[in-house]
C-alpha cells in the first residue's frame, strides 16, 4: 500500500500537476540539504518525504500564473 494514498493527496492540492510540481520542488530542496519538517518520515527517499510533508500539511504551496512556490 502506498503512503500517503494518492486520492487523499489530491484533496490537498488543486490538480495532479500541482502535486507533482510541489513534490518535485520540495524533494529538490531536501536533496540540496533542507531539513525535513517531519520528525519520523516513513522513508528516507526525498520524494517520499516531500509527499508525506504535503499530506500532513507541513508544506504549503501558492500558485501563480507561471510558477508554483512552496513554503
Curated annotation (Swiss-Prot):
Alphabetical GO biological process terms: DNA-templated transcription
One Pfam family for this entry, by name? RNA_pol_Rpb6
EC number(s) recorded for this UniProt protein: 2.7.7.6
Q: Which UniProt keywords apply?
A: DNA-directed RNA polymerase, Nucleotidyltransferase, Transcription, Transferase
Cellular component GO terms, alphabetical: DNA-directed RNA polymerase complex
Q: How does it assemble?
A: The RNAP catalytic core consists of 2 alpha, 1 beta, 1 beta' and 1 omega subunit. When a sigma factor is associated with the core the holoenzyme is formed, which can initiate transcription.
Task: State what this protein does.
Answer: Promotes RNA polymerase assembly. Latches the N- and C-terminal regions of the beta' subunit thereby facilitating its interaction with the beta and alpha subunits.
Q: Which family does it belong to?
A: Belongs to the RNA polymerase subunit omega family.
Q: What is this protein called?
A: DNA-directed RNA polymerase subunit omega
**Organism per entry:** Alkaliphilus oremlandii (strain OhILAs)
Gene symbol here is rpoZ
Amino acid at each position: 500500500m502506498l503512503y500517503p494514498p494518492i486520492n487523499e493527496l489530491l484533496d490537498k492540492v488543486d490538480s495532479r500537476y500541482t502535486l507533482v510540481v510541489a513534490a518535485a520542488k520540495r524533494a529538490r530542496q531536501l536533496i540540496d540539504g533542507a531539513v525535513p519538517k517531519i520528525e519520523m518520515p516513513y522513508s528516507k527517499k526525498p520524494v517520499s518525504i516531500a509527499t508525506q510533508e504535503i499530506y500532513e500539511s507541513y508544506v504549503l504551496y501558492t500558485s501563480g500564473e507561471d510558477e508554483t512556490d512552496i513554503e
